[in-house]
A protein has these predicted regions:
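Non-catalytic cap/lid and distal C-terminal segments of serine-dependent acyl enzymes
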Residues: 5-290
């Protein structure tokens, strides 16, 4: 038995059951970030008594589960992924809605952003508030999830995934929060926004607490950077990670014709979940001490 937050609602996309995942959404106050956000939590259906699950935290949470919640009507399709691939590892997925406009760049960057292409969108210095954002997840969101849902709370069973700037903050968490998370995924990471800082920090990090890391980038990315820039900088990040991690724990995929959009990330999502959590297997009856 678990207790969802009192203002939680079950979206239409999952009311009929048979999803493989049942999910709810609620609004939470984030005092450190001085904003409110919707929080989405998906948990496997047909749970056994005493069963507990690994947890995956995802950025841009409104785009994770279904099209009805997504910003432009297209999601990562996590609900559909579990319908199409019922053998995917059974995990709890937590999605936190992002901030609006330039504040998203602030929260999703661990380092100050220095890229001329951003001037078109945000006419002021941004970035560098990633620690504040990650502290919110670690100190507020994760304890709430662990208290109310059947999680396995230890780092070796906890992951984080994001796309674009969400990939940037996920990578930063791999450098700075391995006492909490150990499995990471970055899709179409926009690392060029603070490339030198990202690569320098990666080269200095030990990464001994990183159990798995999945990177992917498309050949037809768009946005602030150009197509070649996305591929080049993701290759550079992969090269830096590969110096620190054994090859079986690191995966890098260049997706032919992959674009910078949720529809493209939805196609990669099953591979991400499978790679990050397949060594754990099904939910555990007797989890490690919490």
């Amino acid at each position: 038995v678990y207790n969802v937050p009192k203002n939680s609602k079950t979206p239409k996309a999952c009311r009929a059951g048979g999803c493989g995942v049942e999910y709810t959404k609620c609004q939470v106050d984030l005092p450190r970030l001085q904003r409110k956000a919707r929080l989405y939590v998906g948990i496997p259906e047909k749970k056994e008594e005493g069963e507990r699950f690994p947890v995956l935290y995802m950025h841009d949470g409104h785009n994770v589960f279904s099209d009805e919640d997504a910003f432009d009507g297209v999601s990562w399709g996590l609900i559909q992924a579990y319908r199409d691939w019922p053998g995917l590892p059974r995990i709890i997925v937590v999605g936190l809605e992002c901030a609006n406009g330039g504040r998203r760049f602030d929260e999703y960057a661990g380092f100050p952003i220095a890229h001329p292409g951003l001037d078109r969108f945000i006419p002021k210095p941004v970035g560098g508030k990633g620690d504040l954002y990650l502290d919110t997840i670690v100190s507020q969101i994760k304890p709430m999830i662990d208290q109310n849902y059947p999680t396995i709370s230890s780092p070796e069973y906890t992951g984080m995934v994001g796309s674009s700037m969400g990939g940037v903050i996920t990578h930063y968490a791999a450098l700075t929060r391995t006492g909490v998370f150990s499995r990471f995924g970055s899709l179409s990471g926009a690392f060029f926004v603070s490339e030198s800082s990202v690569l320098h920090a990666t080269e200095r990090a030990t990464l001994t607490g990183v159990h798995k890391f999945f990177l992917s980038v498309g050949t037809r990315e768009c946005g602030v950077g150009d197509q070649e820039e996305y591929v080049r900088v993701n290759q550079a990040v992969f090269a830096a990670l590969s110096k620190k991690m054994p090859p079986e724990r690191l995966r890098f995929e260049i997706v032919e014709n992959g674009i910078h959009h949720e529809s493209a990330w939805a196609k990669v999502l099953p591979s991400v979940i499978r790679f990050l959590f397949s060594d754990i297997g099904k939910g555990l009856q007797h989890p490690p001490a919490r």
